A protein has these predicted regions:
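Active-site-adjacent "subsite" loops/lids of carbohydrate-active enzymes
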Residues: 1-20
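Active-site-proximal substrate-binding groove within the catalytic cores of carbohydrate-active enzymes
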Residues: 19, 32, 58-170
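Aromatic- and acidic-residue-enriched carbohydrate-binding clefts of CAZyme catalytic domains
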Residues: 1-5, 32-59, 101-103
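Short acidic/polar active-site loop segments enriched in Thr and Asp
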Residues: 24
Length: 170
């Protein structure tokens, strides 16, 4: 996104698809570690310029999408927290805040720290163990279980009712 021609192509392509298909929510994921790519070709005294250009291009990309489609909601995957800056939050939501998920202590720490700055974020649970489940609670919540297994439903129903009773605190 730091290359103007590539950015222009991407804006046209994605915006065209959003319009043609009638997309209401666009999810942008970032599942890679980009530092290696950003540092390639940078002089030692110019470290960071590729990253800056990429981030500015990403902001421009999101701005173009919302300018073309005023109804569009953008969900930007936080990329392990690397996209949780104020400018990104102005342009999108981070419904999935980090791929460091399913570890109760980490989830509690992120919920506490991010809730001071971001009203909407979360992860969820892959467990029906009450401690694990509660640690994943937040303003957004997903539950990744084997839904084909009938034995999960009573526990899942009980814990989801508990979540519904406290979600207004998030």
């Amino acid at each position: 996104l730091g290359h103007p021609k590539a950015l222009a192509w991407l804006k046209d392509k994605v915006s065209g698809m959003i319009g043609a298909i009638g997309v209401d929510i666009y999810r942008h994921d970032f599942n890679l570690y980009p530092l290696h790519y950003w540092r390639r070709g940078e002089a030692p005294d110019r470290q960071g310029i590729n990253e800056i250009r990429y981030i500015m291009g990403l902001y421009d990309f999101f701005d173009a999408l919302t300018a073309d489609h005023s109804h569009l909601l953008i969900d930007s995957c936080a990329s392990g927290g690397r996209r949780l800056d104020f400018e990104m939050q102005r342009r999108s939501l981070a419904l999935w805040r980090s791929d460091l998920c399913w570890e109760p202590t980490a989830e509690q720490c992120m919920t506490y720290a991010l809730s001071l700055w971001m009203p909407l974020h979360g992860v969820g649970s892959i467990s029906l163990q009450p401690y694990d489940f509660r640690s994943g609670m937040g303003s957004t919540f997903s539950l990744a279980l084997d839904y084909q297994n009938p034995s999960i439903w009573s526990g899942a129903t009980r814990l989801l009712k508990e979540y519904q009773s406290v979600r207004h605190f998030f």
